[in-house]
């Protein structure tokens, strides 16, 4: 995150500044150094659909297709 010194006992950076503004900008909060969860979920969902489609394709072609 940032090099700010925290006054909280567990070392967290406060969520809001005293005037009510967010302590960390929204854009950097969601895109700083990590993959967004929606991107991971989309890739995982596409992989699941691909594998299930492969099983359905295999049931009509090759062994087990009658």
From Swiss-Prot:
Keyword Plastid: no
Annotated signal peptide: none
UniProt topology in membrane: Single-pass membrane protein
Localization: Cellular thylakoid membrane
Any single GO BP term: photosynthesis
GO cellular component terms given for this protein: photosystem II reaction center; plasma membrane-derived thylakoid membrane
Keyword Cytoplasm among record annotations: no
Main location: membrane
Pfam family, one: PsbJ
Source species, domain of life: Bacteria
Keywords, sorted A to Z: Membrane, Photosynthesis, Photosystem II, Reaction center, Thylakoid, Transmembrane, Transmembrane helix
TM helices/strands, residue ranges: 37-57
NCBIfam families: PRK02565.1
Subunit composition and interactions: PSII is composed of 1 copy each of membrane proteins PsbA, PsbB, PsbC, PsbD, PsbE, PsbF, PsbH, PsbI, PsbJ, PsbK, PsbL, PsbM, PsbT, PsbX, PsbY, PsbZ, Psb30/Ycf12, peripheral proteins PsbO, CyanoQ (PsbQ), PsbU, PsbV and a large number of cofactors. It forms dimeric complexes.
HAMAP family with a match to the protein in the record: PSII_PsbJ (MF_01305)
Name of the protein described by the UniProt record: Photosystem II reaction center protein J
Species for this entry: Synechococcus sp. (strain CC9311)
